[in-house]
């Protein structure tokens, strides 16, 4: 059975074969994760990627599986977070696909949700021209989350769709054609242990949230942090709120840590197509052009009003971002 047997009109015809291949591998990866520790150690380190990050066994397994499945498809160029350079799969192909085959792999041994993130552009004459372009030129992007449910969230530029894997039929079932980010929430996601390294506008925003009912926001907030981008994204699509991974003062973190091509652009596409916002803290993510395949960027996304508020904190005068929370010239609701 094909992985998307129902609602064939939901996927553009020119992308149907590629989506079938992605879906088939995602189902295989989900099964492999479910048997982790029985057949093999999926969490064991087996090398490093181009940026020196440790690669788990499942990182490599997933990358190899997606790449092999896309051979002979309409994908001309394949760029993976796990590989130094892009590769040509089909000289006659019309698409360029970037992928993070296994996002959140540091969570494998803890049984927290991990995922696959993908982005599809029209192929240009070269791999560099295909991938080093604005995220606004994407024709499709999405992610698969391997959790208590296996879900795929995907956009083809006309809203965001949600599919759930039916374990019985081993196929993805369309359950929502028009996912929307809830407009408000009292949740924010950030790694607070890095507070001392953040820029002042980010510290000011978090200070005002942490101040709760005693601060200018006049309400209490909850902090979340899962260290799995797909899990954070899935929660925000379900409950709203905002995710922040800012630049900071540490060496190697001047532009954040998340990669534009494999993580930020596709997630921003999914979120904005669902009515949310996505920026680098100040400017829209989808309006940016990466300088190299593994370029990084600060990343803020979630409910549109929350993202706009964080941008407003960057517009405050220096003395206000340094001031106690009661003195900022911002809207307070």
From Swiss-Prot:
Its keywords, alphabetically, are:
Calvin cycle, Carbohydrate metabolism, Cytoplasm, Hydrolase, Magnesium, Metal-binding
Q: What is its EC number?
A: 3.1.3.11
Q: Which residues bind Mg(2+) 2?
A: 100, 103, 263
Q: What is its main location?
A: cytoplasm
Q: Which GO terms describe its molecular function?
A: fructose 1,6-bisphosphate 1-phosphatase activity; magnesium ion binding
One Gene Ontology BP term is: reductive pentose-phosphate cycle
Coiled-coil positions = none
**GO CC terms on record?**
cytosol
Checking Pfam families in the record gives: FBPase, FBPase_C
Its UniProt pathway annotation is: Carbohydrate biosynthesis; Calvin cycle
What reaction does this enzyme carry out catalytically? Answer: beta-D-fructose 1,6-bisphosphate + H2O = beta-D-fructose 6-phosphate + phosphate
Residues at which Mg(2+) 1 binds: 81, 100, 102
Q: Which cofactor does it need?
A: Mg(2+)
| Subcellular localization, as worded in the UniProt entry | Cytoplasm
Query: Any note on cofactor binding?
Result: Binds 2 magnesium ions per subunit.
Family, per entry = Belongs to the FBPase class 1 family.
Relate the assembly described in the record: Homotetramer.
NCBIfam families found in the cross-reference section: PRK09293.1-4 (NF006780)
Q: Which HAMAP family match?
A: FBPase_class1
PANTHER family in alphabetical order: FRUCTOSE-1,6-BISPHOSPHATASE-RELATED (PTHR11556), SEDOHEPTULOSE-1,7-BISPHOSPHATASE, CHLOROPLASTIC (PTHR11556:SF35)
Q: Mind telling me what this protein is named?
A: Fructose-1,6-bisphosphatase class 1 1
Taxonomic lineage of the native organism:
Bacteria, Pseudomonadati, Pseudomonadota, Alphaproteobacteria, Rhodobacterales
